[in-house]
């Protein structure tokens, strides 16, 4: 074979290899560093992170915050991040996993020191933006991250109101014209400020070959705050928070699917409370599909059922009484991690249990459109009622298939610490993560 033919073949193979690498789906693994401070079976260690890394393309460390006084990005847990050197411990794994990109996320609903510091940051002008950008770049570089994830804590949509079907049409009509849906009268101004911040931040990071991703948190109206066509070129990828559409904190009086793939019609449901709507919104704004990662949660949302909630469990479940009690591991009202949910499914160890440890009835969605749920009707005293909306390895796998079928960038998993990382349920560690990864291959 002539030298020119060898050269042509080599170039063709190089192009093909580059295409294959670029076309590999993302599996962006969010890591809530607070998991390392939990106790008992819920404590998540560096060793656990390392086991998960074999399945991830990116690891996102959560979370940093914003100083409300000077708008600099800062640690919100200095004892863990800096004094105990947890930031450095995590990024030290880059030496063993050079193919994985490590990002530091700011915001993510973890920055609770000040209620509206992110709006203040947007309104701070060029000087405030510059302080944030320079401090973010410095923090990312100091701890050897490959980039920054911007998970801005912006005003949320108002939760769905509980009312009968008879009045729902009029109420929706009235809200549309009275502006009852509006939670930020300056959203158009803030959208322009978000655009300017992202463009300037991207330019600063790119000077140091650093990545920039955007995470759209659940129930933040993308059309209010994100000028998608303008910001997409400045972002390496976008993680959509396509879960927690309904939660017991936002919707205490009725339980419903918290993370459906498609719209579940009827019963006063809102058409945008589903993965497909959110994803289509960004595509319609001319964002490349390969920049969009759909979000999947490794936990379920839990409501307390009352006697008035009935015993069918079929959503929408009325007369619920807010968040169900916290689980023994996650210790957060209205939320159970996957290991806790799995332990409540009927099994030999709970077949005779009563009260809060009694098994739940699992209802699987054969269509894979809305998600599974499980419930335990309240007893004769009105106690121990429980309703859970969740994704499991099967539905997580189905959503990963959705991402592949739509040629999306991939999946963002929220988060590693809520998966069954000890293998308590079936013996398989990280069952959610594994199921999603295998379907993305």
From Swiss-Prot:
Descriptive protein name? Chitinase-like protein Idgf3
Q: Where is the GH18 domain?
A: 25-441
Q: Which residues are glycosylated?
A: 221
Q: Which residue ranges are recorded for the region named Disordered? A: 310-331
The task this protein performs is described as: Cooperates with insulin-like peptides to stimulate the proliferation, polarization and motility of imaginal disk cells. May act by stabilizing the binding of insulin-like peptides to its receptor through a simultaneous interaction with both molecules to form a multiprotein signaling complex.
Instruction: Please state the span of the N-terminal signal peptide per the UniProt entry.
Output: 1-23
One GO molecular function term of this record is: chitin binding
Q: Does the keyword Glycoprotein apply?
A: yes
**Compartment list:** Secreted
Q: How is it modified after translation?
A: Glycosylated.
In terms of InterPro entries, this protein maps to: Chitinase_II/V-like_cat, Chitinase_insertion_sf, Glyco_hydro18_cat, Glycoside_hydrolase_SF, Glycosyl_Hydrlase_18, IDGF
Q: What else is known?
A: Lacks the typical Glu active site in position 153 that is replaced by a Gln residue, preventing the hydrolase activity. Its precise function remains unclear.
Q: Which GO terms describe its cellular component?
A: extracellular region
The record's similarity note reads: Belongs to the glycosyl hydrolase 18 family. IDGF subfamily.
Q: Does the keyword tRNA-binding apply?
A: no
């Amino acid at each position: 074979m002539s030298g020119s033919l060898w050269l042509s073949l080599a170039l063709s193979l190089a192009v093909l290899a580059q295409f294959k690498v670029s076309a590999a789906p993302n599996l962006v693994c969010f890591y809530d560093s607070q998991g390392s401070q939990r106790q008992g079976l819920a404590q998540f260690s560096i060793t656990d992170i390392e086991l998960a890394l074999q399945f991830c393309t990116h690891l996102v460390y959560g979370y940093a915050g914003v100083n409300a006084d000077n708008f600099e990005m800062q640690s919100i847990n200095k004892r863990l991040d800096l004094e105990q050197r947890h930031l450095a411990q995590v990024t030290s794994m880059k030496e063993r996993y050079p193919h994985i990109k490590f990002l530091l996320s700011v915001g993510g609903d973890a920055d609770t020191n000040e209620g509206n510091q992110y709006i203040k940051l947007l309104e701070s002008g060029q000087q405030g933006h510059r302080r944030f950008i320079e401090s973010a770049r410095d923090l990312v570089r100091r701890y050897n991250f490959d980039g920054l994830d911007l998970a801005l804590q912006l005003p949320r949509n108002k939760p769905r109101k509980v009312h009968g079907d008879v009045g729902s049409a009029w109420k929706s009509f009235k809200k549309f014209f009275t502006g009852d849906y509006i939670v930020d009268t300056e959203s158009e101004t803030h959208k322009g400020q978000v655009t300017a911040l992202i463009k300037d931040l991207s330019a600063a990071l790119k000077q140091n070959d650093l990545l920039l991703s955007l995470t759209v948190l659940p129930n933040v109206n993308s059309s209010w705050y994100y000028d998608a066509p303008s910001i997409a070129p400045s972002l390496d990828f976008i993680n959509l928070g396509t879960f927690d559409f309904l939660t017991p904190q936002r919707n205490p009086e009725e339980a419903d699917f918290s993370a459906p793939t498609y719209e579940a019609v009827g019963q006063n449901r809102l058409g945008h409370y589903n993965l497909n709507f959110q994803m289509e919104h960004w595509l319609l704004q001319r964002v490349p599909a390969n920049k969009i990662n759909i979000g999947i949660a490794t936990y379920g949302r839990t409501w307390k059922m009352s006697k008035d909630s009935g015993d069918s469990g079929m959503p929408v479940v009325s007369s619920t009484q807010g968040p169900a009690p916290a689980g023994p591991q996650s210790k957060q009202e209205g939320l159970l991690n996957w290991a806790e949910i799995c332990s409540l499914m009927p099994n030999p160890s709970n077949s005779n249990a009563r009260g809060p440890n009694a098994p739940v009835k699992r209802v699987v969605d054969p269509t894979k459109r809305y998600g599974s749920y499980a419930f335990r009707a309240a007893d004769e005293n009105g106690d121990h009622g429980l309703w859970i909306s969740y994704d499991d390895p099967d539905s997580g796998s189905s959503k990963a298939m959705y991402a592949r079928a739509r040629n999306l960038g991939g999946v963002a998993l929220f988060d590693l610490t809520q998966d069954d990382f000890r293998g308590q349920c079936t013996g398989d560690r990280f069952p959610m993560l594994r199921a999603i990864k295998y379907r993305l291959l």
